């Protein structure tokens, strides 16, 4: 989706989420040359009651922690992997993923001009999930926030995710 984005400040990050406490992680691009501010690549938020089941199916009790790693597998195509694979979130308090398309060219369909077709493509952007690298991608219910240049989705569990149309 993007060829001219600045590099990411970090392509991977790890933190501990504790059931009963809110947790979040942000990944950022590096600032462009001559600029002080950078732009956000993604936000990941876990509510205090989001953690539900470990990958082995066992319940996560209040106060238990889970080590979470987010790795950008392909920054040009906005592909991200979340570990531990198989972690499940509560349906009443799902985790929230926001992926930003701030660094994506305004000519999103790459036809050489910025026009209404690009706006239509932006409205069709969605977060997609892939259970394993060899399996197909499936669309996740998502909301485009065009003015903020981002797509939001609630996550039921961990796997690979990408922003696409």
Model feature map: region roles:
Residues 106, 135-136, 161:
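Eukaryotic short linear interaction motifs
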Residues 80, 133-142:
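Surface-exposed loop/edge segments in extracytoplasmic proteins
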Residues 43, 96-98, 152:
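Beta-strand secondary-structure signal
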